[in-house]
Amino acid sequence: PENLGGFGKDFVTGMLATEKLGGAYSFAVSISAHTGIGTLPILYYGNEVQKQKYIPKLASGEWKASYCLTEPGSGSDANSGKTKAVLSDDGKHYHITGQKMWITNAGFADVFTVFAKIGDDENLTAFIVEKDFGDITINPEEKKMGIKGSSTCQVFFNNTKVPVENLLGERQGGFKIALNILNIGRIKLAGAAIGSCKRVIDHSINYANERLQFGRSISKYGAIKHKLAEQAIKVYASNAAVYRCSQNVDDAIAALVAGGMNKEKATLEGIRQFAAEAAILKVHGSEVLDYVVDEGVQIYGGMGYSAEAPMERAYRDARINRIFEGTNEINRMLIVDSLLKKAMKGELDLMGPAQEVAKELMSIPDFSAGSDDPFEQAHTQIKQFKKAVLMIAGSAAQKLMMQLSKEQEIVMNISDMIIELYVAESVLLRVEKLMKSENSSKISEQTDILNVYLYDAADQLNKYGKDALNSFADGDELKMMLMGLKRFTKQKPFNVKEARRRIASHLIAEGKYCY
């Protein structure tokens, strides 16, 4: 907020800034941890006195922030932390004792958001702890695979004396704070990954244009064009999904503020409403980044393995993103869990549409030619993809019921289908919007991106769907649903090679990512 030293801009603007900083390697990690998980707990959960004391100095950079949640025995199971907070006899202070690890910015942070359990409490409580409070030991910097320019240390709180007024939010409300801040961190990570991807693609294109083999630039060869096109297609898709969700969040915040909620609470609630999407974006964005840097190394060939070339650092730095903000496996579980919880609360009708799809399986397929309009065809394909997801998710939920959460392989199959569906639809919506607002001749390659993405998504959905169905169905039921899956993921013939070549040729001519 402007009254606390910020710019007061909307969520989309914040995401654009996050994307721009995303290509800054280790610095991106440091500043994201400071402005995100380090500062936001105080902004969103602090009382007015806490916000006035800390936020202006954090916003200006005078103070740097860190976030102390992870412990040696509590990673994904964050609420199992052992750090303790004991109230002093005079009731004026808490004495915090415990060990935190993998703490970003720990080496230079002035302020820590620390999670601990008071007495025998079941859930965590958050505290604002200043480095100057003393009795804090910062271990030497960790020797990491990547992001070597960022600070990552273990932090020990040795009976650290913290004023009671530095309790953040409510007692035992720390786990809720952690979850909500992680939702923000996930979508921000996806935005930063886009920035990293675009920088790597620029390097890939420039090297491919400059590197001569057999008397020609390697960018003229089909194998390299395929790699460049795939890098761009995946990043375009991630970009479409990230900014679709970001605008949805802004719209939700605006509606909540209009209804009388204050901006901080509205922001948290707006993002909470899209917790499943945040997990989708985090998984997809981090895995796209891994793909892009891997192909970047390959385009560079032997030089890509050299620490003197830009790909080596990009390759190492990218890997942490599949672990940050909850591992991708945990996030895949969260996607399905979030949707099932919404269904049980009546916020999402999952079983109704799933039952309609089940009825459709018994009917005769529609063999009509359909519309000639490419966007209408794409919308029809997305509708079919949705039927595939509903069929499998609905059947799995109905058949396995409470056991579904224990069948993690099936949950991950369903989650991967949901991710593919959400991202594919996002690409369609983005290209369609551009088609309506710009000269259609200017976005022909973006239409190619849409068509290639849908082509590949159909195969991916079919693969994930078959894996799931073969894991929980059998007999005639299995045969019927496999036929339905084939129907719902049917793909018309399409020359993907030429489409990728057109996409790559545009990238090569521009000398940079240009979509």
Q: Which sequence ranges carry the predicted segments?
A:
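A short, Trp-centered hydrophobic/proline-enriched beta-strand micro-motif
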Residues: 61-69
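Secondary-structure edge/capping motif, primarily at the C-terminal ends of alpha-helices
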Residues: 207-215, 245-259, 299, 396-403, ...
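Charged, glycine-rich active-site and insertion segments that engage polyanionic ligands
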Residues: 270-303, 447-466
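Glycine-rich phosphate/cofactor-binding loops in nucleotide/flavin-utilizing enzymes
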Residues: 16, 37, 292, 303-375, ...
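A short core secondary-structure module
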Residues: 92-138
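C-terminal amphipathic alpha-helical interaction region
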Residues: 361-515
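Internal helix-loop-helix
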Residues: 2-52, 56-62, 103-111, 235, ...
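Glycine-rich beta->alpha junctions and the first turn(s) of the following alpha-helix
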Residues: 137-240, 250, 274, 279, ...
